UniProtKB/Swiss-Prot annotation:
Residues 1-24 form the signal peptide. It comes from Austrelaps superbus (Lowland copperhead snake). GO terms for cellular component: extracellular space. Keywords: Disulfide bond, Protease inhibitor, Secreted, Serine protease inhibitor, Signal. Serine protease inhibitor. This is Kunitz-type serine protease inhibitor superbin-4. It comes from the Eukaryota.
Length: 83
C-alpha cells in the first residue's frame, strides 16, 4: 500500500473513532434498563437513557420504586449514561 493510501486509511480510522458513539460497555449497567414508572400515584417528569436511540428521553415517574435508570434532569441523565 502506498503512503498516500496509508494516510487516507489513518484519516478515515481517526474520523470513525471521533464519530462513533461511546461504547455501551463504558456506561453503567443500569443505563440499559427499561424505564420503570413505579407503582405509586405521584406522576412527575423524569428522564431515562434509551440505549436504542443513544439519548435521554422524558417519561412519567410515579414517585417511588422504579429502577436506577431514572434521573431528575436530562443533564444528569446525559452525564451518567450518554457520555
Amino acid at each position: 500500500m502506498s503512503s498516500g493510501g496509508l494516510l487516507l486509511l489513518l484519516g478515515l480510522l481517526t474520523l470513525w473513532e471521533v464519530l462513533t458513539p461511546v461504547s455501551s460497555k463504558d456506561r453503567p449497567n443500569f443505563c440499559h434498563l427499561p424505564h420503570d414508572t413505579g407503582p405509586c400515584k405521584r406522576n412527575t417528569q423524569a428522564f431515562y437513557y434509551n440505549p436504542v436511540y443513544h439519548t435521554c428521553l422524558k417519561f412519567i415517574y410515579s414517585g417511588c420504586e422504579g429502577n436506577a435508570n431514572n434521573f431528575k434532569t436530562i443533564d444528569e441523565c446525559k452525564r451518567t449514561c450518554a457520555t
